[in-house]
Amino acid sequence: MPRVKGERRLEILKALAQMLEQPKWGKITTAALAEKLDVSEAALYRHFASKAQMYEGLIEFIENSVFTLSNKIAQDETDGRKQASKLVEMLLAFAEKNPGMVRVMTGDALVGEHERLQARMNQFY
């Protein structure tokens, strides 16, 4: 059965996020990511021009998820204190559900990667 367009790309991002969840992983190499997926490094680069683009994919997921939930909270709750409380709860729940993404959000996973990644994550805050 043929793959749905973008399916492999999503698999790559999920594998990268899973690797980021493991404390033993420092800087993740494309070789290690390819090995986890049982594909060649060249296969990774058919879907992403660079490792930086893979991290950008994770950042886009973070932005889309958090901003969508934040906007819903802002629409549903008019009291500022309750909004703030719900925003904190949402961020903590997101972090608990996506521990690998926390390393991206804090910049830990981006150390030694392209500077634009850290700059983009800084804009998030």
Spell out what each predicted region is.
Residues 1-23, 27-36, 53-56, 65:
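Basic, helix-initiating cap at the start of DNA-binding domains
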Residues 38-48:
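Short hydrophobic/aromatic patch on the recognition helix
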